[in-house]
Amino acid sequence: VGIIGYGTMGKSFAKKLQGFDVKQVIYHDLLHMEEDGIGTQVSLEELQATADVLSLHTPQTSLTVGMINTKFINQMKNNFWLLNTARGSAVVTDALVNGLKNNKILGAGLDVLEYESSSFENIFKAQEDNPSFSYLLGSENVLLSPHVAGWTLESHRKLAQIISEKICSTFGTSIKNKS
């Protein structure tokens, strides 16, 4: 499994994979990431040469917008599965569709899309004449979710804790050790 981006979400994904006994290769744009015994940091070229599954966990930056394009896809040695729970702008949708059509990409799990704005609520109407979007909707090997993959029980608890702490710090009370 190739992981691009090893911040909080990338690390969390890698930890979840430990129970599946898979080799994890990680590309992170920092020179040296902290060794944690979970995966092996590799160059982008080595990741492209070894990964059968590619999972994206990157922020949106000038380096990541359009990162997964036709050139990147063609440089993957193996046919591969693509997971994008990061930013929709990281994957060029037309390149993804072409990769799916020629079986370079075996399937995709997409929690984010290049076309999405702040929410999914209007995406179907806005993209109704977009052939690439229509292809993704109709593909049996594509799973789309409306940018909710990170909404786990753990993330809800963490969000509630952070909000509670901010409210209490603003009003001068503490919630530590209160249940």
Regions found by a protein language model. Give the residues of each.
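Rossmann-like dinucleotide/phosphate-binding beta-alpha-beta segment
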Residues: 1-78
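Rossmann-like dinucleotide-binding domain for NAD(H)/NADP(H)
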Residues: 79-82, 87-179
